[in-house]
Amino acid sequence: HGQTLWHRPPTPKRRGASWQLLQAPLLAQLLQRPVVHDFRAADLALGGQGAPLVPRADAALLGRIDGWRGLLNLGGIANLTLIPPRCGPEGTHAVLGWDCGPANTLIDLAVDRFSDGLRSFDLDGAMAAAGSCRESWVHRWLEEPYFQELPPKSTGRECFGRDDLNRRLEQMLSVSPADAVATPTRLSAALVAHDPSRLPAPQAIPPLALPVSRGRHPPPALAASPHPPLHPHALRLPPPPG
């Protein structure tokens, strides 16, 4: 799919929709290669969430092992892939994937706000590491409706954008810039640790060591989480033939 400009997941009373910026025929002509596209739109048309799309690719590229395998993608939104074991009673489970909630989006917006637009992200997690997390607010936020939903579910910047950041900052009242970055950073870590343990039996997943993509090294506030450690992982693909 192309760049996602707008995404609205489905509800029981409303069809989902998504707006992608992509000209697949032009891309096919320029590359002189077949281009398979519109996976997101097709999934939504069939009643799916339309996101995340990466779980199938994760399963195809990495395969199954003797136990559960978890893969975490920390983009603007955190999405999680859980690949079941290759054998045993749990080997019949399907690959699971869903959007946990905000990863970098609230952090980046907070950095942009408190740097007056001079910075767009928290380099090496330095700003979060210099602050203190408002733990009480993280616990309250985890009770919000989206975070209580079970998979499948998807979300985007439409829900966790600038307005959402402003709402959270107003809730915390007087907060330093560093604390305003440390707290949503902690929220991202809590969401990822929170979701697998809430899956209904028999899909309840034991604690996982999660590889991290995009931002290969987790920021200090995320790495310091008391939950299962995050192990950096890089996937190397073979060079194209010829």
What are the residue ranges of the model-derived segments?
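Short beta-strand-loop/turn "lid" adjacent to the catalytic site in phosphate-handling enzymes
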Residues: H1-L21
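Acidic, glycine-enriched active-site microenvironments
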Residues: K13, D179, T183, P219-P220
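Catalytic phosphate/nucleotide-handling subdomain of diverse soluble enzymes
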Residues: P84-R86, L109, A190-G242
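A short acidic Gly-Thr/Ser loop motif
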Residues: N73-I77, G101-A103, L210-P220
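Short glycine-aspartate micro-motif
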Residues: R69-N73, V95-G97
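Conserved catalytic cysteine-centered active-site region
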Residues: L21-L22, L26-A45
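Active-site glycine-rich loop that binds ribose-phosphate moieties when present
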Residues: W19-Q23, Q49-I65
